[in-house]
Amino acid sequence: MSYSDQRELAPHMALVPMVVEQTSRGERSYDIFSRLLKERIIFLTGQVEDHMANLIVAQMLFLEAENPEKDIHLYINSPGGVITAGMSIYDTMQFIKPDVSTICMGQACSMGSFLLAAGAQGKRFCLPNSRVMIHQPLGGFQGQATDIEIHAKEILSIKARMNTLMAKHSGQPIEVIERDTERDRFMSAQDAVEYGLVDAVLTQRA
């Protein structure tokens, strides 16, 4: 295994911290993410793909079943990913009864920024040095000309749908969203507030 291969594997081999709590039945160990889930905190980190999306959807449904009145906090640090996987998270956020508060730490790009903006109104936040990026959907397809035409129509349909939803959540006119997503548009935390993607920049807990 080369050094570069080891570096690529390193994040996946990292140990997840464990938390030990004292209960009436003795000690109980949790991995850190399971312990934070008890506090209704979910992490959306890395590429948005089907497996990760299924886990996040399952966590949101579990927290809704546990308490349908209490907010869920979704922390986002993602470069984006697969549209259909992201839309499964989006639809669940809109479907469940609890408000989903979104917090960007690090970056929320592409599908990450879409999910950031999709949080409950008044409960969408960026940390001070986070970055947000919006753009149009990416796609590529090889095959017969007719199949390429079919896929081109599909991605244009998805683009129009996502622009409509982004306009709804940001309050920007659809024409502005169409123009600004034509190419990568990067924003600071304060820029994201002014654009309507989030409601405030959090510097410290109240």
Curated annotation (Swiss-Prot):
Gene3D superfamilies: 2-enoyl-CoA Hydratase, Chain A, domain 1. InterPro entries: ClpP, ClpP/crotonase-like_dom_sf, ClpP/TepA, ClpP_His_AS, ClpP_Ser_AS. Its EC number is 3.4.21.92. It comes from the Bacteria. Belongs to the peptidase S14 family. Fourteen ClpP subunits assemble into 2 heptameric rings which stack back to back to give a disk-like structure with a central cavity, resembling the structure of eukaryotic proteasomes. This is ATP-dependent Clp protease proteolytic subunit. It comes from Edwardsiella ictaluri (strain 93-146). The gene is clpP.
